[in-house]
Amino acid sequence: MQSKPYKLNYPILSRETVMEGSDMKVNIVTCDIGQCIPWHFHSEITDSFVCLKGPMVVETRAPRKTYILNIGDRCEVPPKVAHHVHGLHDRAFKFLLAQGVGTYDNIPVG
């Protein structure tokens, strides 16, 4: 997977890279109380979420769906599907995020 350089334009507590290869990227993301991953989508890659501390919420548009993940639960968001990630009731949360396969991008959605 080719990665385009990017800078987060939103606050999170931490992001730890577990591995990054030519076609896959895996991070552990930690968000504090009230923090979130804003609405966005990816052109080619699938986001696979595994909740490590929660509960956490993954919301999608088209199709509109809400996934409430407890520790150990997972869900996938395919390419071109806008999604938003936050803690249930704005609580702190932590998740493993596996991304692939394809060129990484992050396209904000209002």
Regions found by a protein language model. Give the residues of each.
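A short, N-terminal "cap"/entry segment at the start of jelly-roll beta-barrel domains
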Residues: M1-N27, P38-W39, P108-G110
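Short, conserved beta-strand element in jelly-roll/cupin
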Residues: C31, S43-V58, A98
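Histidine-centered divalent metal-coordination motifs
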Residues: H40-H42, H83
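A short hydrophobic beta-strand segment most commonly corresponding to one strand
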Residues: S48, R91-N106
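Structural motif
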Residues: P55-V57, A82, A92
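Short acidic-glycine-tyrosine-enriched beta hairpin
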Residues: P63-P79
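Asparagine-centered strand-capping/turn motif at beta-strand->loop junctions
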Residues: V85-L88
